[in-house]
Each structure stands twice: as structure tokens, then as C-alpha cells.
From Swiss-Prot:
Origin superkingdom: Bacteria
The protein, known as: 2,3-bisphosphoglycerate-dependent phosphoglycerate mutase
Membrane-spanning intervals of the chain: none
Catalytic reaction equation(s): (2R)-2-phosphoglycerate = (2R)-3-phosphoglycerate
Family: Belongs to the phosphoglycerate mutase family. BPG-dependent PGAM subfamily.
Pathway involvement of the protein, from the record: Carbohydrate degradation; glycolysis; pyruvate from D-glyceraldehyde 3-phosphate: step 3/5
Source taxonomy: Bacteria, Pseudomonadati, Pseudomonadota, Alphaproteobacteria, Hyphomicrobiales
Its EC number(s): 5.4.2.11
Known function: Catalyzes the interconversion of 2-phosphoglycerate and 3-phosphoglycerate.
Positions of the catalytic residues: H10 (tele-phosphohistidine intermediate), E88 (proton donor/acceptor)
Amino-acid positions noted as binding substrate in the UniProt annotation, renumbered to this chain: 9-16, 22-23, 61, 88-91, 99, 115-116, 159-160
Length: 208
């Protein structure tokens, strides 16, 4: 029985382009982001991958990425569940600020700690630890059981919400996970064993 789980970070958003902290704010994809999402769908199609269900966040950039991937796969009507449990990390008072402006205001070292530490939240926001505590229970309750039943699952979400899943799947530590880069529009294809450990992982980048 195939136990397929594909993780895809949304394509470039308007605020990614402007170098703004986004979090739970809701900008749309750029033209580049749309192209990235479509390319992700084509790479999945070239691998013969199809899905039984899709999970995404409550934010437009992830939902549009999911829809564009599924359109490229010829599955535009696939059941899709959107839940804020899969939302990006909440950047609190940093949300909407240019990252360079934030460094000028608080200092580059402090902003680096907020961005890349595991358990230090920005003012009014979530740490990566907080995000993991939000994402993992939902995943264990709603997503993983479907994968283990043999359903082929797509999760289109965000850099930090997906880091929570990759941390568990890849067995990464709280020291290494904050520095993990997940590229926009690049699917990670996991196949799991019966004990939920990873049988194989493939990164479908531009050369896949």
C-alpha cells in the first residue's frame, strides 16, 4: 500500500517580493508565484502523482497554490480542506514590516533571533515552537491517519508550518530546524512505512 504525503510551500507572494514579514496577513501570489505553483503541479504530474485529498491553510497564497497544482494535475475538483492550524507562523508586531526596517528598529541580532531561534517569539507573535505546537496535533489527528490508510495527500502551506512537519518526518532537532530552507513552489514527496517512518523522500526542484 502506498502511503504518499506531498508537502508544498506556496509560490512567491506579493509580500515575499516586497521583503515584508507576512505571517497571518493575506497577500496573494505574484505572477512568479503563480508560475511556481503551476510548475510544481507539472513536476508532480511528470512523476505520475495524483491525490485523493488536499489540505491547506486559511490563507489565500496557500489555497491558490493548492488550486493551481491540482489544476495542472487535472484534479481541480479534488476535496480540499482549509484550516488555520496550517497557517504560517504569526509574526505579531513584525507583520507587515519590511525586514530591513525591522532590523533598523530592533537591531539585526534581535530580528535574527526572532526569525531563526526555535522558542523566542517576536512581540505579540509565535515562536517556531508555538507553530509546531499548533500544526502537529492537527496533522496527527487529521492528516497522518489518512496517509496511513493509503490516501494520497497533498499539503500546501507555508515555510514555518511545513517546517513543523519536516522536523518530525526527517527527525531534525530543535537546533537545526529553524535554519531549514523550504523553497517556494518546490514539492517534497514523502513515502511512509507502516510504522510512519520515512521510506523515501524526493525534492522535486527545477531539475527533477
Amino acid at each position: 500500500m502506498e502511503r504518499l504525503l506531498v508537502l508544498a510551500r506556496h509560490g512567491q507572494s506579493e509580500w515575499n517580493l516586497k521583503n515584508l514579514f507576512t505571517g497571518w496577513r493575506d497577500p496573494d501570489l505574484t505572477e512568479v508565484g503563480i508560475a511556481e505553483a503551476r510548475a510544481a503541479g507539472r513536476r508532480l504530474k511528470a512523476k505520475g502523482i495524483r491525490f485523493d485529498i488536499c489540505f491547506t491553510s486559511a490563507l489565500t497564497r496557500a489555497q491558490r497554490t493548492a488550486a493551481l497544482i491540482l489544476e495542472e494535475l487535472g484534479q481541480p475538483d479534488l476535496p480540499t480542506i482549509a484550516d488555520e492550524a496550517l497557517n504560517e507562523r504569526d509574526y505579531g508586531d513584525l507583520s507587515g514590516l519590511n525586514k530591513d526596517d525591522a532590523r533598523a528598529r530592533w537591531g539585526k541580532d534581535q530580528v535574527h533571533i526572532w526569525r531563526r531561534s526555535y522558542d523566542v517569539p517576536p512581540p505579540g507573535g509565535e515562536s517556531l515552537k508555538d507553530t509546531v505546537a499548533r500544526v502537529l496535533p492537527y496533522t496527527m489527528r487529521e492528516i497522518l491517519p489518512r496517509v496511513m490508510r493509503g490516501e494520497r495527500v497533498l499539503v500546501a502551506a507555508h515555510g514555518n508550518s511545513l517546517r513543523a512537519l519536516v522536523m518530525v518526518l526527517d527527525g531534525l532537532t530543535t537546533e537545526t530546524i529553524p535554519g531549514l530552507e523550504l523553497w517556494t513552489g518546490v514539492p517534497l514527496v514523502y513515502r511512509l512505512k507502516a510504522d510512519t517512518t520515512v521510506e523515501s523522500k524526493e525534492v522535486l526542484d527545477k531539475d527533477a
